[in-house]
Amino acid sequence: MLENATILITGGTGSLGRKFVPMTLKKYNPKKVIIFSRDEMKQWEMAKSFSDDPRVRFFIGDVRDKDRLHRALAGVDYVV
């Protein structure tokens, strides 16, 4: 189901995202995982763990910002 899918994870730098991202990459081989978070420092720290994986992308934003969220959702198959 998630194989070759594009997945957006809101609050992706939190505890759920830190567990979900590596497990999903390994188990389901998605086309892309977008980590959507408003915390730039946490994104920078998390990016170091996935620097060799081109499937992982980071998107700065807040779910309360409708326009930013709309841009992040472009081409997304699943939202977590």
Where are these regions (language model features)?
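Conserved glycine-rich Rossmann-like NAD(P)H-binding loop of the short-chain dehydrogenase/reductase
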Residues: L25-K42
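Conserved Rossmann-fold cofactor-binding substructure of NAD(P)-dependent oxidoreductases
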Residues: K48-D52, R57-Y78
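N-terminal Rossmann NAD(P)H-binding glycine-rich loop of SDR-like oxidoreductase domains
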Residues: A5-K27
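SDR active-site strand-loop-helix element
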Residues: T10, F36, V79
